[in-house]
Amino acid sequence: MHGQPHQHLHTSPTAPFNMTIPYQPSTYYGCSNVTESYKPLGKIGEGTFGEVFRAEQITTKRHVALKKILLHSEKEGFPVTALREIRILKLLRHENVIPLVDLAVERGDQSKKERGCVYMVTPYMDHDLAGLLGNQSVQLSPAHIKCYMLQLLEGIGYLHAKKFLHRDIKAANILVNDQGILKLADFGLARGYDGPAPNSQTAGVNTENLTAMVVTRWYRPPELILGDRKYTTAIDMWGIGCVFGEFFTRKPIFPGASDVDQGSKIFQAVGVPTEDTMPGWSVLPGAQNSNIWGTDATNKLDKLFGRLSKDGLDFLKGLLLLDPTKRLTAIGGKNHAYFKTEPLPCQPHELPKWQSSHELDNHKRREQEKNESKVQPPPREKQPPVREPRDRDRSRDSRPPRERDSRDRRPPRGRYDSFERPERRPEGPRDGPRDRDRDEYPRELPPRDLPPRDLPPRDRDYPPRERDWDRRPPPRDRDYPPRERDYPPRDSRDRDYHPRDRDYPPRDSRDYPRDSRDSRDSRPISPSRERFHKRPQFDMYSDTDYDRERDEDDRRRRPLPRDSSRDMTRDVYVPSRGREPRELPKGPPPAPGDKVEDKGESHNKDDKPCDTENPRDSDKSRDLGPPPGPPLPADGPPPPPSSNPPRPSETYGGSRPPWRRDSRDRRESRDRDGRDRDGRDRRLSSSRYARDEFDEYGRKRPRIER
C-alpha cells in the first residue's frame, strides 16, 4: 500500500486461462451451520411468521430456540420483516427484551429442489404467557401478577425510549423462563418512529402515516379499529392493558370475530367514543360503523372486573382509555399506586416454577381433551335380515329367473332429459331366489318386530286398522322402478331418427313471398296475404317500359328478369312483340376516318353538320348508308308507315338515352317509324334528338344542325 513497504508475497506459477477451478461454497461470516452447531429437540411454536424449535447447542450444551424464517417466494428474496427484526434486536440490550444470540443457516439441495433457510437463534424460554394462562394448574397470586407487569412495563419502556414501536403486544409474545424473568419477543412488526420519546404524561407525537393493519385483532386498540394512521406508542399500552385483564380472566378479554365485532366488544366494555372521551374520532375512516356500535358511552370495566382492587381497576382503566393522548405510558404505569399497595410485587426469583407451557402445548392439550370427551358408543350387533311372510304360492319362487332383456336396462343417459329420472327402488324385501341379481339395493328391514297380521274373512268387510297399515303389501312377481312414458325403450325405428311432417309448422305460415317457396307447394295464397305477394308480371316481349311519373301503380324497385342468353350490354329496352332486335356491331369502336356501316344513326364521316335537308343528297354523307326502316324506292314518295313499325328503342334515334328517358319519349313515340310526315328522318329534323344522340358504343354524337 501507499506509504508502506511492499511485503514479500509468495507467488505461484500462473495457471492457464482454461484451467477449471474447483467449486468452493461461500461462507457466511457471523452465521453458523444449523446442522453442525445445533441439535433439534422438538417444535414449540408455529404461526405465519414461521416455526420455532427447541434445540441444544452442541458446544455449550445450553438450550436455545431456533426461529425458522420462511422464504415464501424466491423472487421476493429475504423477508423485509425478518431483516427489520434482526436489525432491531441487534440494537437493543435489555434484561426484559429477548436477545439475538446467533444466525444459523441451512443449505439447500439444488438437485432435490430444496431451498435453504435461515434460523434466528435466541435463548430458550420455558413458558409464554399464553401457555401459562391456559394451563389450569398454574395459579397466579396478585404479587405474581404485579411482578410480571412491572417487568413488562420495564421492557416496553426501554423500547419506547429507543423510539421503537412493538406493534404486536399479546400474551403469546411475552416469554417467561424458570428464573421468573419476563422478556418481550417477536419484533417482526416493530419499527422506529420520528418524534419525541414518551414521558410520564404523554405517549409522544407522531406526524408520519403508518400502516393500520398491525397488532393482533384481539389486542388492537380502538384508534386502529377506526383507521387512524398517525398512532403513537399508546397502541402498545392498550395491548398491555389487554394482557393485564387476561391475567384475571385467563382468556382474551376482547375476542372479536372481525374488525367491526372487535369494535363492538371494546365499546360495550369501555363505552362508545364521543368527542369528550375520544376527540376527533368522528373524522376517522372507521366512524361510518358508529350506528352498529350504539350510543351507550358508559364504562363497564368495574362490572367486568369486580375482583380487582380499587387501585387495580384504576390501573386497568388508565391502560384502556379511548383517548390515546390520555392513556397511561410505561413510565406512568410503573409509578402507579397499584404497585405500591399491598400485596407488593415479588421478586422474579420468588416466582414458582411450573412445567413448561407454551401456546402450542395448550392447543395439543385441548385437542386431546376433545378427543377423550368423544366416547365412542359400543358397536351395534348386526342383526339378520327380517323377511316378510309371503301369502302366495311358494312354488313360484322355485322357478329359475328369466333372462335379462331390454326391459331390465335403465334409460340411457341424455335420452330422457325432459322427464324426471327414475328414483331408486324403495327399501324392503325382494323376490327371494329371483332377487340375487339386485344386490346393490338394501334388503333389510328396520330391526323391529312386525305386528301380527289378522286377515278378516272374505265374506265380511272390516275397516282398516292402523297396525295393518304398517305392513307392506306382498311383492309382485316382478318389480320395476317407476318409469315415465315409453320405458322400457322400444326397438329402434326409422321414424325415431327422421323428422316427421307434423313436427314442423304449416308451410303457409312462413313470412317470405310465395315465389320463393318450394315449387311443389301449389296451394293458393289466402286473400289476406295476396297483397304481400302481388308483383308486376313482366313480359320481355310486351311494352312495359318503366315510367317514373306513373303514380297509379305501386313503385317497386324490382329489376327486369334477366335473360342469360342475351348480351346485357347490347341493349337496354325490351323489344316489341313479334320482332327480333336488330344486332349491333361488336368489337372495338371504329377509329376516326374509318368507314362505318349505318345502324340507323345519322352522321357523316367527317363529323360535320350536313348542308342539305336530306343527308342522302350530300356528298359528305356517302358513308351513312340507308336510313332505318323499310328501303325507299329510287323515285317516288316514301311508302306509308308500316303496320308493325320498329320501336325507337331499336334504333336509339327516337328516344333519349335509357338513363335520361321520361314521359316526353312516350308522347313522341306515337310515330313509331322514326320519320316525319314528309318522309324526312326525324333525327335530323329535330334539334332535340340531334342534341342528345349517342352511338352504339355509348359515345355522345356531335351536334347536328339543319
UniProtKB/Swiss-Prot annotation:
Annotated region described as Disordered, given as residue ranges: 360-706
Keyword Kinase tagged: yes
InterPro entries listed in its UniProt record: CDK, Kinase-like_dom_sf, Prot_kinase_dom, Protein_kinase_ATP_BS, Ser/Thr_kinase_AS
Domain Protein kinase: 38-339
Keyword annotations: ATP-binding, Kinase, Nucleotide-binding, Nucleus, Serine/threonine-protein kinase, Transferase
Lineage per the UniProt record: Eukaryota, Fungi, Dikarya, Ascomycota, Saccharomycotina
Protein name: Serine/threonine-protein kinase BUR1
Family: Belongs to the protein kinase superfamily. CMGC Ser/Thr protein kinase family. CDC2/CDKX subfamily.
